[in-house]
């Protein structure tokens, strides 16, 4: 079987992490099929095949673009594939052969994002209509849609009532092995980014549903009510959303207390970006990990922190309850007072903190990219045979 993988996202934020890990582990579990891995110019050199059956194909077409539906489509057709795997929803809509997708969430369907957009409202609404049309077509055209949680599967079944449950396959994500490596340059990293005190950490994008505003408000309560003297460190990609958050932090007079760091993405024009190794160092030195999102599909970053002994406090939402069970402290993401109280409990109670560190290590063991790859490979085989 000849399989194509759309890896143009390779290594970039959430979808890129997923793509990177699924490819690396498919290389380990599949020694018989041949793969064409489509990459952009920015990440072409980042991927180095470790399985002779995996070959790289340059497909320098921007995602969510017109070229994705024209030039990229031609590139894929030239490979004469038996199956095309897209670890997202943005398929070439005119691709005529079998497709398997992996779609991480349905946030644009289940959470109103108008408030958070940086675009003119009329333009945003046009993009939203186009997004939903392509999304629906991707589900329709997919032999199977791989989803990362039961929560996301339930949302698919609710919004696409014309499709049977058999359309979807559950495959939990895992912890990137690169994020469990030990690093020894903690002091150097802290000094580089101006982290002069103890700190609370959060890693992820700054879209409206991530509720980063709520995190900053929580920090203000923690500082004023509980006398917290540490810093809040937010690591995100550099984009319009993080730039807007930086302005809000400055407006509140918190620029010395709330630090915004940008992690590395290929299109970043910044000279100062946080590398993967530095994120490991930050996680190993932080006091507590906090995520206040209103919506998530799997929420991997807290798990990555727990893998190196960082206890987590998370928003009490369905996805988090499913993935993390009793291994984290939960709070109402709409209640900044409660958020601060729960975070402070971990900060001041070493025994409680140690309890959740141990629970975290145990919970991490449940998730493995090798399992994800094996499930995905079985989906490929089923699609090819039917």
Annotated model-derived regions:
Residues 1-386:
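Carbohydrate transferase catalytic cores enriched for Leloir-type hexosyltransferases
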